[in-house]
């Protein structure tokens, strides 16, 4: 039984939208094969996304004090997203989050400057903001861990193991 049949059996209908994440670039024949198969099954909303780690890019937060930009001493906030083009964005899935103490911030791991994920959209109607929010949500789906989040979304992280 293929994945579409399993989904239809469980949900009694096919999904309206399919998003595929992978770590390597999509080749033209992959795009054609995936989109043709899904369209034949009646699925028209298809997004094909690559997610890679950009280890060489590091940013720290800045704050404005006395009219000047100063280093904040902390990494950028988790969820920071910089759109590079209509197809590419940088997303920080690891970074500062609000603490339960109102005057503090929490940085999981407490050291090193986090590197962003590079999101590249190869195909589909989905906007990068929605895609980035979905990827960020998938970083909170590792139920085998007590961590607040993982650096990689579950769609990529589980394929690494």
What positions do the PLM features span?
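Long, contiguous domain-sized segments
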Residues: 1-161
